[in-house]
């Protein structure tokens, strides 16, 4: 369409061509501007230094006004070479690396890696019952702490600072339990091939039951603050929409997939660590949006409390039971008393290892320095992390170190949905969509 047809008149000036219009011409002008796609578009970087991108995530947004026309994710700012480093450590030492990937759910990182090793060693059925129950207990505590961070940070990004405050208040209680049981608040390296590092300390079950009772009183606060808040609901409902077909096409899992109403949870569909013996329900929603993902995380914390109660009751009947496989060629002597430094350097430990048998000392030295050998082969074992399917593909060439260890991190896979969720929406809703995915960049970049 010619310019003179669009506008009522024009004239050439020293500043270029100037158009003049009358009050009746605005519809024609709007049509002309809509055809000129480059007119109003700008490209902005959101992140990697941004308080609302859940770490060092860079989003390249192309905007037209406040509408997002294209969204791309830039990753890699937190790459630490974890998978490559694991090839230069023993199978047991690898746990100390993988626990640092998704730093909000370290027990799940350890669990998927250890399950892969145990499958290659063919010792899955020989892991002590108490060790399996402790693994389930720790993972469900970890699920609660991770969901609390997701809800707290998501609320903070929307301006609901009270949600952030109480979310981190409860998470601190979980970290205190982790410190009591493992000695560390994060990066535990507690789940080992063949079992766990050590037994539960005295009084731990009482502390866990006290936490469960307290959380049952605290969780309704989140419903009062969020579900009953029309502003909070208005910012989440209909935002970041992605239906079941889109989730399956992109390989999305976790709350993002279950928000479409599809009850896919590996604890039910492909049980591990005895999850098939626990009574709990898979939480779903049917809105396929950010609000549904929030409600799923809130409901899953209730289910985790149910599992924790069952695990605590089982542990009460397993007092004194072993927590490490009896095979001395695989498991470190976890039944010995642990010193105050957490390194196993108690007097009983030293006396048994160094003072009773030269063969025992040699064997222990080789086990610690060289490690055990894993038969050649490969295995992929997934677990249901707070963010979705977290899997480890471990490959052995018959040596004492992994030939290859690769992880399928749900944050990496789910981050593909950024473009689909954000494009066509407002720039303010990009943050809501990202928060509903709940990515952890340590797991994305590794």
Curated annotation (Swiss-Prot):
Family label: Belongs to the complex I 49 kDa subunit family.
One Pfam family, short name: Complex1_49kDa
Chain segments annotated as transmembrane: none
Record-given protein name: NADH-quinone oxidoreductase subunit D
Major location (coarse): membrane
PROSITE patterns: COMPLEX1_49K
Function comment: NDH-1 shuttles electrons from NADH, via FMN and iron-sulfur (Fe-S) centers, to quinones in the respiratory chain. The immediate electron acceptor for the enzyme in this species is believed to be a menaquinone. Couples the redox reaction to proton translocation (for every two electrons transferred, four hydrogen ions are translocated across the cytoplasmic membrane), and thus conserves the redox energy in a proton gradient.
Catalytic activity reported: a quinone + NADH + 5 H(+)(in) = a quinol + NAD(+) + 4 H(+)(out)
Subcellular compartments: Cell membrane
One MF annotation (Gene Ontology) recorded for this entry: NADH:ubiquinone reductase (non-electrogenic) activity
Entry keyword set: Cell membrane, Membrane, NAD, Quinone, Translocase, Transport
Quaternary structure annotation from Swiss-Prot or TrEMBL: NDH-1 is composed of 14 different subunits. Subunits NuoB, C, D, E, F, and G constitute the peripheral sector of the complex.
